[in-house]
UniProtKB/Swiss-Prot annotation:
It comes from Homo sapiens. Residues 16-32, 313-333, 378-393 have a biased composition (Basic and acidic residues). GO terms for cellular component: AP-2 adaptor complex; clathrin-coated pit; clathrin-coated vesicle; cytoplasm; cytosol; plasma membrane; presynapse. The lineage of its organism: Eukaryota, Metazoa, Chordata, Craniata, Vertebrata. This is SH3-containing GRB2-like protein 3-interacting protein 1. Residues 561-567, 593-595, 667-670, 813-818 are annotated as: Interaction with DPF motifs-containing proteins. It is found in: Membrane, Clathrin-coated pit. The gene is SGIP1. Residues 1-116, 143-205, 223-278, 313-524 are annotated as: Disordered. Specifically expressed in brain. The modification Phosphoserine is found at residues 78, 104-105, 107, 149, 151, 156, 169, 236, 265, 287, 300, 316, 319, 372, 399, 486. May function in clathrin-mediated endocytosis. Has both a membrane binding/tubulating activity and the ability to recruit proteins essential to the formation of functional clathrin-coated pits. Has a preference for membranes enriched in phosphatidylserine and phosphoinositides and is required for the endocytosis of the transferrin receptor. May also bind tubulin. May play a role in the regulation of energy homeostasis. The modification Phosphothreonine is found at T180, T182, T247, T259, T324, T328, T410.
Length: 828
């Protein structure tokens, strides 16, 4: 084949140039050119060489630039051919030779011009064909990215007028062709398979939310009373109480999806959600005064004291029963459910479906698994008996049903929602236990290897459980994407209140399926599956992380890395367009996360330095509830804007030790430190102001939703992500008209869903907009139903609180801040 690629030395018709070719390849490097009969003679050889450099732009007929004489077109079009199919060079008139001033050497070359090259082309052998076919992949791999020169044979800037395509018929060969370089077809590597890229980017957000549903918010400890309500859009199994207890609530909070699924999951809302939506429509809006009933879940069976005890991890048999009396059981808003140990286990925020709670009053969808106490009391008792069993509890559940329903619902009660076992210890590994939602290292998902800290004798990493296949960090494991325990997309359990937790699997920062997302403190109340430790840094699991089981190793003199996360949930109820009727309640929690290797460090250093930290902007908080087992504070401090706390190190060490024994595969341990409410200033404290207007007629219904991004509610203006507006429409909708912007209509559940990727000051009109829709009805008129809104935000809090360490021995490797919509409703 290589010989077949060689270039012939054929000369374009009418050209007198002789290209000396020493290798029979017709190299165009020669400078000597003989002028055509009509070409003006060159005054010098140098001029000839210069002119030769210009030959690159010869005319299409092969004549050089400056050729003005008549062209023998007939001869050009039908040249004489020899027996081999080559065109016969015309004889040059003697007068031509006398006009040039070339040296004798040129004349000799002229004589050689009539020489012919005998080129043989070897046909491709069958064996070669097979060989080539067999090495196609190898060639692609080896030269796929090599850009070949467009004209490998040519070395001179001048093009060879006689270059002719090989393999042409004799007639075609006779026709000179311009040797313009043809861009070579460079073999390119086939595009990476989308499946291969999946691990890099993670599964679709919606799938992640499905898994996140497992994160269903835990009922907020009664400590808070109305504490953090579940996102209205999410139907949380934990929320057993009807939406508002007072005036007919728009919907049962459980029905309301706890968190807007970050992925903007499909409208499909768990049947439970539909039910909740139905209830919402049926029930009258709660009165403004009935704030608690609106936001506080009604956990009927539990007493506030019991919840408080469960909320806190107790190292002693006795647990403080004196949870702040301020919080009433009803206030006990479902705190984010302790996410199951496995990221997938934790309910991912369901598709907006969770918001579906507002869905029309159709028959309730599948029973809210979350709602069912699932023997929540029993679970709570177990939790009280073993503070840390909570973590294991989820893991023990083997059937998705058990976990999805019972566990999801159970987690909230067992660990008083406020505190998932004070330490949602091994976030990933932890079971439904409140803090365990961290999803640090669920068996299904690979644990993120902790970066070993300097240590003379780093402990060997714990063995990887067979159930946890080792995956590259950032690559979601199969288990992460579809955990057997994760609630079905339609599961009634509310997705974690805050879909904040992105699945950790994809990339450490934006993975969608990881348990971390599930474990992530759904902003609601679920303890953020705070962080995972990797390469010397902590990453909030909700952001997604690849977990590795390697323990943290460090020397006795090294500062211990600690991560902190503030997760807040904003609950709001908007009535019409009257700002004075807006009811707002903001709850939050502060969690500290420790690398798993810290237990080994404490074992080698039984008297570690006391961990002391200071909360800044403390004056903006109210009803602050420190973990009674782990935190101490000085109430005599004069500065109202800051509050200093120190950790009871013996209790912390004992707790972490127990957790490490129960969850040896965990890579980090989350410990709930503070629960609090934020002083709210009405509608001014809501990051997204809403107003809904209905016009219901027998044959049609017009719906208008106005929203406005409010930067004043945040200490740092950050975008609201994955904003979803869900409204159930009854009256037998037969046709959807004039929907602006485009929305998704779920005919089965009779709900309309708008999804907006983000709303911020950079959005059109500065974050101010409207949603419009007209519905044709067959059984109208419709009855106005509550609008459920979900969103998440990272990088800021509504309280403006911050934290800093006091003293030596520790350092913050990460401080995470985020907030999300809890029960965010608007009515006509």
């Amino acid at each position: 084949m290589m010989e077949g690629l060689k270039k012939r030395t054929r000369k374009a018709f009418g050209i007198r140039k002789k290209e000396k070719d020493t290798d029979s390849t017709g190299s165009p490097d020669r400078d000597g050119i003989q002028p055509s009969p009509h070409e003006p003679p060159y005054n010098s050889k140098a001029e000839c060489a210069r002119e030769g450099g210009k030959k690159v732009s010869k005319k299409s007929n092969g004549a050089p630039n400056g050729f003005y004489a008549e062209i023998d077109w007939e001869r050009y079009n039908s040249p004489e051919l020899d027996e081999e199919g080559y065109s016969i060079r015309p004889e040059e008139p003697g007068s031509t030779k006398g006009k040039h001033f070339y040296s004798s050497s040129e004349s000799e070359e002229e004589e050689e011009s009539h020489k012919k090259f005998n080129i043989k082309i070897k046909p491709l052998q069958s064996k070669d064909i097979l060989k080539n076919a067999a090495t196609v992949d190898e060639l692609k791999a080896s030269i796929g990215n090599i850009a070949l020169s467009p004209s490998p044979v040519r070395k001179s800037p001048r093009r060879s007028p006689g270059a002719i395509k090989r393999n042409l018929s004799s007639e075609e060969v006779a026709r000179p062709r311009r040797s313009t370089p043809t861009p070579e077809l460079i073999s390119k590597k086939p595009p990476d398979d989308t499946t291969a890229l999946a691990p890099l980017f993670g599964p679709p957000l919606e799938s992640a939310f499905d898994e996140q549903k497992t994160e269903v918010l835990l009922d907020q400890p009664e400590i808070w009373g109305s504490g953090q309500p579940i996102n209205p859009s999410m139907e949380s199994p934990k929320l057993t109480r009807p939406f508002p207890t007072g005036t007919p609530p728009p919907l049962p909070p459980k029905n309301v999806p706890a968190t807007p699924p970050r992925t903007g999951s499909p409208l499909t809302i768990g049947p439970g959600n539909d039910q909740s939506a139905t209830e919402v429509k049926i029930e009258k809006l709660p009165s403004i005064n009935d704030l608690d009933s609106i936001f506080g879940p009604v956990l009927s069976p539990k007493s506030v004291a019991v919840n408080a005890e469960e909320k806190w991890v107790h190292f002693s048999d006795t647990s403080p029963e004196h949870v702040t009396p301020e919080l009433t059981p009803r206030e006990k808003v479902v705190s984010p459910p302790a996410t199951p140990d496995n990221p997938a286990d934790s309910p991912a925020p369901g598709p907006l479906g969770p918001p579906g709670p507002t869905g029309p009053p159709g028959p309730p969808g599948p029973p809210r698994n979350v709602l069912s106490p699932l023997n929540l009391e029993e679970v709570q008792k177990k939790v009280a008996e073993q503070t840390f069993i909570k973590d294991d509890y989820l893991e023990t559940i083997s059937s998705p049903k058990d976990f999805g329903l019972g566990q999801r619902a159970t987690p909230p009660p067992p660990p008083p929602p406020t505190y998932r076992t004070v330490v949602s210890s091994p976030g990933p590994g932890s079971g439904p236990g409140p803090g365990t939602t961290s999803g640090a290292s669920s068996p299904a998902r690979p644990a993120t290897p902790l970066v070993p800290c300097r240590s003379t004798t780093p402990p060997p990493p714990p063995p990887r459980p067979p159930s946890r296949p080792k995956l590259p960090p950032g690559k979601p494991g199969v288990g992460d994407v579809s955990r057997p325990f994760s609630p079905p997309i339609h599961s009634s359990s509310p997705p974690p209140i805050a879909p904040l937790a992105r699945a950790e699997s994809t990339s450490s920062i934006s993975s969608t399926n990881s348990l971390s997302a599930a474990t992530t403190p759904t902003v609601e109340n679920e303890q953020p599956s705070l962080v995972w430790f990797d390469r010397g840094k902590f990453y909030l699991t909700f952001e997604g992380s690849s977990r590795g089981p390697s323990p943290l190793t460090m020397g006795a003199q090294d500062t211990l890395p600690v991560a902190a996360a503030f997760t807040e949930t904003v609950n709001a109820y908007f009535k019409g367009a009257d700002p004075s009727k807006c009811i707002v309640k903001i709850t939050g929690e502060m969690v500290l996360s420790f690398p798993a290797g810290i237990t080994r460090h404490f074992a080698n250093n039984p008297s570690p330095a006391a961990l002391t930290f200071r909360v800044i902007n403390f004056s903006r908080l109210e009803h602050v509830l420190p973990n009674p087992q782990l935190l101490c504070c000085d109430n005599t401090q004069n500065d109202a804007n800051t509050k200093e706390f120190w950790v009871n190190m013996p209790n912390l060490m004992t707790h972490l030790k127990k957790v490490s024994e129960q969850k040896p595969q965990a890579t980090y341990y989350n410990v709930d430190m503070l629960k609090y409410q934020v002083s709210a200033q009405g509608i001014q404290s809501t990051p997204l102001n809403l107003a809904v207007n209905w016009r219901c007629e027998p044959s049609s219904t017009d719906l208008r939703i106005d929203y406005k991004y409010n930067t004043d509610a945040m200490t740092t203006a950050v975008a609201l992500n994955n904003v979803q507006f869900l409204v159930p429409i009854d009256g037998g909708v037969t046709k959807l008209q004039a929907v602006l912007p485009p929305a998704v209509w779920n005919a089965e559940q009779q709900r309309i869903l708008w999804k907006i990727p983000d709303i911020s000051q950079k959005s059109e009109n500065g974050g101010v907009g409207s949603l419009l829709a007209r519905f044709q009805l067959s059984e109208g008129p419709s009855k106005p139903s509550p609008l459920v809104v979900q969103f998440t935000s990272e990088g800021s809090t509504l309280s403006g609180c911050d934290i800093e360490l006091v003293g030596a021995g520790y350092r913050f490797s990460l401080i995470k801040k985020r907030f999300a919509a809890g029960k965010y409703l608007a009515d006509n």
